[in-house]
Amino acid sequence: MRVSQTYGLVLYNRNYREDDKLVKIFTETEGKRMFFVKHASKSKFNAVLQPLTIAHFILKINDNGLSYIDDYKEVLAFQETNSDLFKLSYASYITSLADVAISDNVADAQLFIFLKKTLELIEDGLDYEILTNIFEVQLLERFGVALNFHDCVFCHRVGLPFDFSHKYSGLLCPNHYYKDERRNHLDPNMLYLINRFQSIQFDDLQTISVKPEMKLKIRQFLDMIYDEYVGIHLKSKKFIDDLSSWGSIMKSD
């Protein structure tokens, strides 16, 4: 085994035998790995075994089996997120999305930093729905989906009232609408935002203000994109879909 010091985000844990746990951690430098924690309830690591916990770990890495946690420091527990059902649900979804987007044991520091920053912004109170949309758009390439939301697939002009074409997997400008009789007839303003989401840097993001009607259009479009081009169905996604129906009751209370 080798020793590695790295930041890591706990994805989930599950019981193993009587009092042991298997803990999956997405680390910045070692990728996603499974860690064995013996006597978890009595372990000094118990405080950092919960999902959505980030810490600086000292790890014993086994490239051919289970790895082990040797020590930790600098714990970030996302208290605001964990105390809010809506924030927690969206945070859990993007974490699950990151989990399925890359293989185990493969380092992806860029994705780790992106996920960590997204969770921090949710914790800080920025719009968790739009942050999730940005995460979804920028994660598409991890699933091998390369869609251009910037210019027309035929003439490459920009800044026009575009529509999306599944036939051409991209945008059509008004001069080329005729190329696809089954184009989606989408709101061009929504596609403009999707294009912004594809390239936006979180360091440039200070505030988010998107009307509910536009949020719904974005949500429906990204659901369509993920269904057709990615094809994954996560329990955490179904839960936030259900929130849109009964969650409004809780918000009104």
UniProtKB/Swiss-Prot annotation:
Signal peptide: none annotated. Belongs to the RecO family. Involved in DNA repair and RecF pathway recombination. One of its GO terms (cellular component) is bacterial nucleoid. HAMAP family: RecO. GO terms for biological process: DNA recombination; double-strand break repair. Keywords: DNA damage, DNA recombination, DNA repair. InterPro entries: ARFGAP/RecO, DNA_rep/recomb_RecO_N, NA-bd_OB-fold, RecO, RecO_C. The keyword DNA damage applies. PANTHER family: DNA REPAIR PROTEIN RECO. This is DNA repair protein RecO. SUPFAM superfamilies: ArfGap/RecO-like zinc finger (SSF57863), Nucleic acid-binding proteins (SSF50249).
